[in-house]
Amino acid sequence: MAEAPQVVEIDPDFEPLPRPRSCTWPLPRPEFSQSNSATSSPAPSGGAAANPDAAAGLPSASAAAVNADFMSNLSLLEESEDFPQAPGSVAAAAAAAAAVAAAAAAAATGGLCGDFQGPEAGCLHPAPPQQPPPPGPLSQHPPVPPAAAGSLAGQPRKSSSSRRNAWGNLSYADLITKAIESSAEKRLTLSQIYEWMVKSVPYFKDKGDSNSSAGWKNSIRHNLSLHSKFIRVQNEGTGKSSWWMLNPEGGKSGKSPRRRAASMDNNSKFAKSRGRAAKKKASLQSGQEGAGDSPGSQFSKWPASPGSHSNDDFDNWSTFRPRTSSNASTISGRLSPIMTEQDDLGNGDVHSMVYPPSAAKMASTLPSLSEISNPENMENLLDNLNLLSSPTSLTVSTQSSPGTIMQQTPCYSFAPPNTSLNSPSPNYQKYTYGQSSMSPLPQMPMQTLQDSKSSYGGMAQYNCAAGLLKELLTSDSPPHNDIMTPVDPGVAQPNSRVLGQNVLMGPSSVMPAYGGQASHNKMMNPSSHSHPGHAQSTSAVNGRALPHAVNTMPHASGMNRLTQEKTALQVPLPHPMQMNALGGYSPASTCNGYGRMGLLHQEKLPSDLDGMFIERLDCDMESIIRNDLMDGDTLDFNFDNVLPNQSFPHSVKTTTHSWVSG
């Protein structure tokens, strides 16, 4: 046991052994341990001790030769791989290593014989004579490595100790190629390739089961699909896996097909590819922006796409953005200070809110709607807006239909000149035309009385405060029943009686035909849609009496004319008054006894709105006022408008609209 450290001291001389052993993970030496127990330098002592007969029976010269051959071959292979540039030095190093190995083997055998098998002195003698033979092989050793390398190359696992893979230098692609070439038809299925690997490659012999084959089988599948040298051919039989064949045209193999993975790992290549893609995208975007000014490109873009939100596409968004009634939207156009519902009131859109959807057809045929909804007229009304401090200016009638949203909005106070009907009427200046909310028509006086279906209720009737009506009742005018007898008590409303003088002519259906009424419809309709409960729309006028009996309800004076108007007013009141004067068209502006325009049937629309001759409303109101109405001796029209911007005379104190000078 004292010489055991000597064996350990000899180990540092085997520097080629620990170095390749630390560099290559498949240990090469255990393969030769089966040939002899004395193959490894530390093991001979234990091996010989354990098997003294074997140690004694085995010639020491042969053991030394085996050790010398193995060490020389191993060291030669290692040095040839590590230092391929110096073949001369490789041979010298191999010779030196072989000599050291032979000496170590001889010393080991000699030690064994001397220490453990002292009686067998002959063991020491055969060993020294056998030492010259190892130098002989050493002298012949340079030609030996090719043979040894060839024999090792036959086994895939031992092609080189510095091999790339555990089974040798062959890659998966090389193994697959050999497998396919070994087949008779030069084609194999995937399962057949697996079988060939397990049978032909020693490394995979014990790795054929499912647990240990997942890794290398996955690698084979990866290489089959990665390399272009392998092609997949559909199998003729149904349900059978495809054939894998070698590409007859010759595909790339080796490391070049790995450019995909390399491009991801190699930042320079990946950055280049991304840079090219970014440049291409930028060029496409710049091309689109450059062509964005052309007329054709405006239609090529999808207007709802986020990329199309350029300045020239805001008009597309502004068409439906205001429908959200968002006051915060800057695209929705002018925000009306009157009501939030009127944000969208534009050219020709007023009728969509004045009339319910059921009356859309009739409303679309009204030629005056475009004029009514003229924003200039609306702005003129707003300019003349006068907020009265009178507490009763905006009193909402309680009899108004429940659906009607009466808002105490600014009242249009049209103070007429004192020259109207030659009588100063201070109370008349209190006539306020409050703006009602844009409620759908079912709450509006679109309905005429019982049988007058041709009148579309006062589009813009003017609210008169109940308190003001009382004041007018107490004025010089004769009692209201002298002028209009309440025909329909069910419709009559106590506070909204048509006073002889203050019958506010809500521009009801036909009133556009009556001079200034048309201008009122044009002015007031978009903004002030009469409160049905409060609008004194006594536009019931006998058409034949238009030039003479236009329901000119005198306000303070003009009582002498009431007698002339009684017959014209009282007779037709029980029924809707037909205005037959203008061409005989019969949209009658009816009032229900108390001058309440169409309050009888507010819960529903006229059944024949489509049959109304609304298209005739486009007649020249100016000519009618001046030619027909001014011819009547009983009429005293004054064209000195309080609202000069309004293109309608409103100083006439008729029960119709035109005295809307207030």
Swiss-Prot record:
Enumerate composition-biased segments (Low complexity): 33-62
Give the N6-acetyllysine positions (modified residues). K252, K255, K269, K272, K281, K430
Q: Where is this motif: Required for interaction with SIRT1?
A: 469-473
Post-translational note: Phosphorylation by NLK promotes nuclear export and inhibits the transcriptional activity. In response to growth factors, phosphorylation on Thr-24, Ser-263 and Ser-326 by PKB/AKT1 promotes nuclear export and inactivation of transactivational activity. Phosphorylation on Thr-24 is required for binding 14-3-3 proteins. Phosphorylation of Ser-263 decreases DNA-binding activity and promotes the phosphorylation of Thr-24 and Ser-326, permitting phosphorylation of Ser-329 and Ser-332, probably by CDK1, leading to nuclear exclusion and loss of function.
Q: What is its main location?
A: cytoplasm
User: Pfam families, from UniProt?
Assistant: Forkhead, FOXO-TAD, FOXO_KIX_bdg
The protein's matches in SMART domains, at most eight in alphabetical order, are given as: FH (SM00339)
Phosphothreonine PTM positions: T24, T340
Record's subcellular location: Cytoplasm; Nucleus
DNA-binding region location: 167-261
Question: Per the record, which residues fall in region Sufficient for interaction with NLK?
Answer: 290-570
Where are residues bearing Omega-N-methylarginine located in the sequence? R258, R260
Show where the record puts the motif Nuclear localization signal. 258-260
Do you know what upregulates this one?
Up-regulated during preadipocyte differentiation. Down-regulated in these cells on treatment with IGF1.
| Protein purpose | Transcription factor that is the main target of insulin signaling and regulates metabolic homeostasis in response to oxidative stress. Binds to the insulin response element (IRE) with consensus sequence 5'-TT[G/A]TTTTG-3' and the related Daf-16 family binding element (DBE) with consensus sequence 5'-TT[G/A]TTTAC-3'. Activity suppressed by insulin. Main regulator of redox balance and osteoblast numbers and controls bone mass. Orchestrates the endocrine function of the skeleton in regulating glucose metabolism.
Name the record gives this protein: Forkhead box protein O1
